[in-house]
């Protein structure tokens, strides 16, 4: 219904912004990912998705069209509402969500606050085929990079690093070097931990 909004950025916080569009202030819910991509100038354009319920109209905004499309996929899953989808996009990068769904990585999806095992599994079951087709992902390369990532995380845990902090570093490495070997991931992680 409302494809995008552009105007003057009046207020911003990590979860919402107010955009003045010709004298009307629109309250738009955003993810942390979008918050990080907001321009430093006063003028902003967000791609939006309007959710109309019996008791409310909620507008969700995204800095990138791709994030909006992922949001729409996520809310199509039974048990995932707009707020949980926004939490998912705030917790991990949109590309990581796509890779986790495409590779069937229940652990990554489940690591998001508010997502249990059943919801993570349902998300993968409902969206895996769509994600593989829409994003033209090669299932073999995804599972290979996930295996390397998991092996590297296990090795870092054995070396005494806390899993959460190691996970963040390893995710960044895998995002920049998707074909990295286990050894390369560990070496790069040791430099950053």
Curated annotation (Swiss-Prot):
Its main location: cytoplasm. Residues 1-63 are annotated as: Domain I. One of its GO terms (cellular component) is Holliday junction helicase complex. Residues 64-142 are annotated as: Domain II. CDD domains: UBA_RuvA_C. One of its GO terms (molecular function) is four-way junction DNA binding. Residues 143-145 are annotated as: Flexible linker. Homotetramer. Forms an RuvA(8)-RuvB(12)-Holliday junction (HJ) complex. HJ DNA is sandwiched between 2 RuvA tetramers; dsDNA enters through RuvA and exits via RuvB. An RuvB hexamer assembles on each DNA strand where it exits the tetramer. Each RuvB hexamer is contacted by two RuvA subunits (via domain III) on 2 adjacent RuvB subunits; this complex drives branch migration. In the full resolvosome a probable DNA-RuvA(4)-RuvB(12)-RuvC(2) complex forms which resolves the HJ. The RuvA-RuvB-RuvC complex processes Holliday junction (HJ) DNA during genetic recombination and DNA repair, while the RuvA-RuvB complex plays an important role in the rescue of blocked DNA replication forks via replication fork reversal (RFR). RuvA specifically binds to HJ cruciform DNA, conferring on it an open structure. The RuvB hexamer acts as an ATP-dependent pump, pulling dsDNA into and through the RuvAB complex. HJ branch migration allows RuvC to scan DNA until it finds its consensus sequence, where it cleaves and resolves the cruciform DNA. This is Holliday junction branch migration complex subunit RuvA. It comes from Flavobacterium psychrophilum (strain ATCC 49511 / DSM 21280 / CIP 103535 / JIP02/86). The gene is ruvA.
């Amino acid at each position: 219904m409302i494809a995008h909004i552009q105007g003057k950025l009046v207020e911003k916080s990590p979860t919402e912004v107010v955009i003045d569009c010709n004298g009307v202030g629109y309250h738009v819910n955003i993810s942390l990912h979008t918050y990080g991509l907001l321009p430093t100038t006063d003028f902003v354009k967000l791609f939006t998705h309007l959710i109309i319920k019996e008791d409310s109209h909620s507008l969700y905004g995204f800095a990138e069209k791709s994030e909006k499309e992922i949001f729409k996929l996520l809310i199509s899953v039974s048990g995932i509402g707009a707020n949980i989808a926004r939490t998912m996009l705030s917790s991990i990068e949109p590309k990581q969500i796509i890779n986790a769904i495409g590779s069937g990585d229940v652990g990554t999806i489940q690591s998001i606050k508010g997502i249990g095992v059943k919801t993570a599994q349902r998300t993968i079951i409902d969206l895996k085929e769509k994600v593989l087709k829409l994003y033209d992902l090669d299932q073999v390369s995804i599972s290979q990079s996930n295996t390397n990532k998991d092996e590297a995380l296990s090795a870092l845990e054995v070396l005494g690093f806390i899993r959460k902090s190691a996970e963040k570093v390893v995710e960044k490495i895998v995002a920049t070097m998707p074909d990295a070997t286990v050894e390369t991931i560990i070496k790069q992680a040791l430099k950053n931990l």
